[in-house]
Amino acid sequence: MNRTNKLILGAVVLGSALLAGCSSNAKIDQLSSDVQTLSAKVDQLSNDVNAMRSDIQAAKDDAARANQRLDNKVSRVRK
């Protein structure tokens, strides 16, 4: 290769590297934004799950009390 071809090839490689660097920063910014959005969604889902846990426990407690009342009625009927 002569010197001119080497310079042209070097310029093309350098230009490609610079363009790739710019697009990578934009992609990194987009990915960072996506991660923040997903983190917020995970936090919201975690809060929803915690709220459901307390609702489920309340429903279990109500069911246990209802079963106890039924057991008491059945034992009174059998006496």
UniProtKB/Swiss-Prot annotation:
A GO term, aspect molecular function: lipid binding
Sequence repeat placement: 25-35, 39-49
Keywords, sorted A to Z: Cell outer membrane, Cell wall, Coiled coil, Lipoprotein, Membrane, Palmitate, Peptidoglycan-anchor, Repeat, Secreted, Signal
Lipid positions (S-diacylglycerol cysteine): 22
SUPFAM superfamilies from the UniProt entry: Outer membrane lipoprotein
Induction data: This gene is probably poorly expressed.
Keyword 4Fe-4S on entry: no
Lipidation (N-palmitoyl cysteine): 22
Region (Disordered): 60-79
Membrane topology per record: Lipid-anchor; Peptidoglycan-anchor
Coiled-coil region list: 28-76
Gene3D superfamilies: 1.20.5.190
Signal peptide per UniProt: 1-21
One GO CC term, this protein: extracellular region
GO biological process entries: lipid modification; periplasmic space organization
PROSITE patterns in the cross-refs: PROKAR_LIPOPROTEIN
Broad class of where this protein is predominantly found: membrane
Modified residues (N6-murein peptidoglycan lysine): 79
Compartments it resides in: Cell outer membrane; Secreted, Cell wall
Family membership noted in the UniProt record: Belongs to the Lpp family.
Quaternary structure annotation from Swiss-Prot or TrEMBL: Homotrimer.
Function: A highly abundant outer membrane lipoprotein that controls the distance between the inner and outer membranes. The only protein known to be covalently linked to the peptidoglycan network (PGN). Also non-covalently binds the PGN. The link between the cell outer membrane and PGN contributes to maintenance of the structural and functional integrity of the cell envelope, and maintains the correct distance between the PGN and the outer membrane.
The protein's name: Major outer membrane lipoprotein Lpp 2
Organism: Salmonella paratyphi A (strain ATCC 9150 / SARB42)
Phylogenetic classification of the source organism: Bacteria, Pseudomonadati, Pseudomonadota, Gammaproteobacteria, Enterobacterales
Gene: lpp2
